[in-house]
From Swiss-Prot:
CDD domains: OmpA_C-like. PROSITE patterns: OMPA_1, OMPA_2. PANTHER family: LIPOPROTEIN YIAD-RELATED, STATOR ELEMENT OF FLAGELLAR MOTOR COMPLEX. The keyword Signal applies. The gene is oprF. It comes from Pseudomonas aeruginosa (strain ATCC 15692 / DSM 22644 / CIP 104116 / JCM 14847 / LMG 12228 / 1C / PRS 101 / PAO1). This is Outer membrane porin F. It is found in: Cell outer membrane. InterPro entries: Bact_OuterMem_StrucFunc, OMP/PagP_b-brl, OMP_bac, OmpA-like, OMPA-like_CS, OmpA-like_sf, OprF_membrane_N, TSP_type-3_rpt. It comes from the Bacteria.
Length: 350
């Protein structure tokens, strides 16, 4: 009956622990365990090896040090006498200090323990009478494995040494056991404090601290670089140079890719605009070449606007005739270079 009551208390405690919200390990936590052990008696005692079932409750003084009180009852214990076997009753109460290795949390935590125990045995004599009590020193070691922050399984090995000398000397016994349990109620580790941003002086309010500001008097609303100086915008540009056959204003197929590149750039920088400039070589009259250069400029503009979707208001077309050569018109090679349309677009990179 005592064993049933003990196990009932332990099981009830485990259920209650599982319903709690404030589960934690470490300092101030409580640990409750149910165990079963195989008890190996000293050879000088008139008792056979037996089983010990019970439970324990422990309190963590620190993250690693636990003080645990346990109670167990011997099960199926028999004495050996000349008159035959006698069923023996008994219990064992222990108080142990336990030191855990490792860090609280999920995983394996080895431990060592030491403490005192009180053993109470009845029906010890061959006439089914008598009581034997003994105070014993405990020493042990084992492993706990935490499946979660709170639930664990344990394997243990404990030795006991009788402090009171009997007729047959001091008695030494040992136990090997398994257990399961919960721990709860500890205080969670305090979260690390939020880093405090360094406070610096910024006299010109440009966002750069005075101790690294190389331009400490920057006017308000001026964009600055990492040194606190007015940012210099990076200028990016695209140039276009489309060549034409003699006396022609039709854009050749091999020039479309270059025109598309210019159109893509203008779409990337929608505030830009451009002037498409048409040119000719020196063959023909000035008036004819002027008209030809304008047709060439308008042909390229049409491709930009109609083929590649650049807004018409952003593209201007102008012809310069033969007035702006870039090569010698006295040679065929030079005249081929001069039959051209040019355009350029600049933008400030953000």
């Amino acid at each position: 009956m005592k064993l049933k009551n003990t196990l009932g208390v332990v099981i009830g405690s485990l259920v209650a622990a599982s319903a709690m919200n404030a589960f934690a390990q470490g300092q101030n936590s409580v640990e409750i365990e149910a165990f079963g052990k195989r008890y190996f008696t000293d050879s000088v005692r008139n008792m056979k090896n037996a089983d010990l079932y019970g439970g324990s409750i422990g309190y963590f003084l620190t993250d690693d040090v636990e003080l645990a009180l346990s109670y167990g009852e011997y099960h199926d214990v028999r004495g050996t006498y000349e008159t035959g076997n006698k069923k023996v009753h008994g219990n064992l109460t222990s108080l142990d200090a336990i030191y855990h290795f490792g860090t609280p949390g999920v995983g394996l935590r080895p431990y060592v323990s030491a403490g005192l125990a009180h053993q109470n045995i009845t029906n010890i004599n061959s006439d089914s009478q008598g009581r034997q009590q003994m105070t014993m020193a405990n020493i042990g070691a084992g492993l706990k494995y935490y499946f979660t922050e709170n639930f664990f399984a344990k394997a243990s090995l404990d030795g006991q040494y009788g402090l009171e000398k009997r007729d047959n000397g001091h008695q030494g016994e040992w136990m090997a056991g398994l257990g399961v349990g919960f721990n709860f109620g500890g205080s969670k580790a305090a979260p690390a404090p939020e880093p405090v941003a360094d406070v610096c002086s910024d006299s010109d309010n440009d966002g750069v601290c005075d101790n690294v500001d190389k331009c400490p008097d920057t006017p308000a609303n001026v964009t600055v670089d990492a040194n606190g100086c007015p940012a210099v915008a990076e200028v990016v540009r695209v140039q276009l140079d489309v060549k034409f056959d003699f006396d022609k204003s039709k854009v050749k197929e091999n020039s479309y890719a270059d025109i598309k590149n210019l159109a893509d750039f203008m779409k990337q920088y929608p505030s830009t605009s451009t002037t498409v400039e048409g040119h000719t070589d020196s063959v023909g009259t000035d008036a004819y070449n002027q008209k030809l250069s304008e047709r060439r400029a308008n042909a390229v503009r049409d491709v930009l606007v109609n083929e590649y979707g650049v807004e018409g208001g952003r593209v201007n077309a102008v012809g310069y005739g033969e007035s702006r050569p870039v090569a010698d018109n006295a040679t065929a090679e030079g005249r081929a270079i001069n039959r051209r349309v040019e355009a350029e677009v600049e933008a400030e990179a953000k």
